[in-house]
Amino acid sequence: KTFFNQEAHIYYFLGCLYEQQEENAKAETAYKSAAVYKAAVSEISLFRALALKKLGRAEEAQRVLDEMLSVAENFIVNKDLRSYFGVGSPSPMPFEYDIEKNNMVDGNVLKAFALLGLDEREKAAAAINKARELSPYDFRIYIFDSLINQDVIYV
């Protein structure tokens, strides 16, 4: 296990399940685990923000979502620049060298997840559709599609 492992989605949904069972102490523990800061910003950061909201830490949640939007916009604006490749960082496969396409997909997917956390569904759908045009089989798009109408996302 490394510091970069992101498990917020697992703990967030576990917290939701405990909440449904009215096991509030266990739900709070799960939400606290989901709210732990991880160094990498990704779509999974949405679940950290949602957990922070559940814990009554709305300002922190807003900062997480704002950071997601900032990183997403950076991908989109600087679509022709490669990201830093360090240990544990994602790196393209040999057949994924269209860096502009990759950055546009990554930026729009991340933006969509952040907007989902802000309950801006129409803007989120528009962002995910831009990504879908470029990479229709990206797994993150399927995840987004399964989340957009789930009540557990809107805290």
Per-region residue spans from a language model:
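Residue-level recognition of tetratricopeptide repeat
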Residues: 7, 41, 58, 75, ...
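Residue signature of alpha-solenoid helical repeat architecture, marking inter-repeat boundaries
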Residues: 5, 39-41, 46, 102-104, ...
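"A position-specific structural signal for the A-helix of alpha-solenoid helical repeats
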Residues: 6, 12-13, 47-49, 54, ...
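Alpha-helical junction/boundary sensor with strong preference for TPR arrays
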Residues: 1, 37-38, 72-79, 135
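Flexible helix-coil transition and linker loops at the boundaries of alpha-helical arrays
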Residues: 1-4, 94-100
